[in-house]
Amino acid sequence: MLVHQVNTKLCSAKQFTHLAKVVTPALSYQASSVYSANLPRLAASPRLFSTTSSAQLRDFFPVKETEHIRQTPPTWPHHGLTEKEMVDVVPGHRKPRTLGDKFAWSLVRISRWGMDKVSGLSSEQQQINKGSPTTSIVAAKPLTEAQWLSRFIFLESIAAVPGMVAGMLRHLHSLRRLKRDNGWIETLLEEAYNERMHLLTFLKMCEPGWLMKILIIGAQGVYFNAMFVAYLISPKICHRFVGYLEEEAVHTYTRSIEELERGDLPKWSDPKFQVPEIAVSYWGMPEGHRTMRDLLLYIRADEANHRGVHHTLGNLNQVEDPNPFVSDYKGDKPRPVAASRPEGFEREEVIGKEVIGKEVIEKDVIGKEVLGKQVSV
């Protein structure tokens, strides 16, 4: 009978030495690769509203590679801004004049208070100044970079809702009336697109956790439906509400810029810090002007523009008046600059008085067109 002798040793000393020489470099290479890949993300500070581990961060919306398409440019390219236009933006406030204005302003203040509470800001970090009708841009204690990003992402996720709702309803209104909308739809949809680009930019810097995602879904559902019903009831109050909301956005970004300039946000002040490529492409940020401060200046200028647009639209006839920000004026008069007027333009400034001279085309009995006299409408 054959008896097989079993070697109980795993390997001899010579074999073990040879095996170690082969395995050790491979293991060390994998370990170093994993460590180096995760090192920058591990360095990121904890994020409010985020349950995602820093080590699990990834490109939140990677570009899909296709065989033929190289890239998809923005549908609405940014119109561009000069440094002077961005620096000249100042916080402002339109004092409530009507009952609707007061209602809209109260809703914004309540929303701001609720956002501060949900964000977990301490009393020293909150901006609300009870002794002033506007929000203070200075607080006793600065926010961290993580707190700012969490706040930006949540706010921008719902900031794009009003423009889309208003644009959609005005589009349907135009179809029902079989009439032109006179430029309102394009401006409102472009605003929604612009706010979404703000969100996508910040998402390249911070991935929200599951709690933030749930809050965004809930807030969007409530906000969209509430805005939908409210705009059907009173478009004027809705535009005033969004105007006040954009005032708060200008205050928020102004405070973040000032904290950055004071050195309270060292990670964003680092000369090595670069803004996401999506921001460089969308705003056309030139070389040497791609810091976090530059990015915040661009976004604040956008919010200032929305502030002026909505306060102005809230002053107009919601059915008949054209959009003054896309219209061509008589006598080569320049278009109004929304960002330059925090409280918006009055109707008389951009449309004119209630009685306007208008040339009427009439036809005589033989069908020839005759230029009629000016009449009042």
From Swiss-Prot:
Fe cation 2 binds at residues 195, 246, 303, 306. Its main location: mitochondrion. It holds the Pfam family AOX. Signal peptide: none annotated. Keywords: Electron transport, Iron, Membrane, Metal-binding, Mitochondrion, Mitochondrion inner membrane, Oxidoreductase, Respiratory chain, Transit peptide, Transmembrane, Transmembrane helix, Transport. Its cofactor is Fe cation. InterPro entries: AOX (IPR002680), AOX_sf (IPR038659). Fe cation 1 binds at residues 156, 195, 198, 303. One of its GO terms (biological process) is alternative respiration. Binds 2 iron ions per subunit. GO terms for molecular function: alternative oxidase activity; metal ion binding. It is found in: Mitochondrion inner membrane. The chain crosses the membrane at residues 149-169, 214-234. Its EC number is 1.-.-.-. It is a multi-pass membrane protein. One of its GO terms (cellular component) is mitochondrial inner membrane. Catalyzes cyanide-resistant oxygen consumption. May increase respiration when the cytochrome respiratory pathway is restricted, or in response to low temperatures. Belongs to the alternative oxidase family. This is Alternative oxidase, mitochondrial. It comes from Pyricularia oryzae (strain 70-15 / ATCC MYA-4617 / FGSC 8958) (Rice blast fungus).
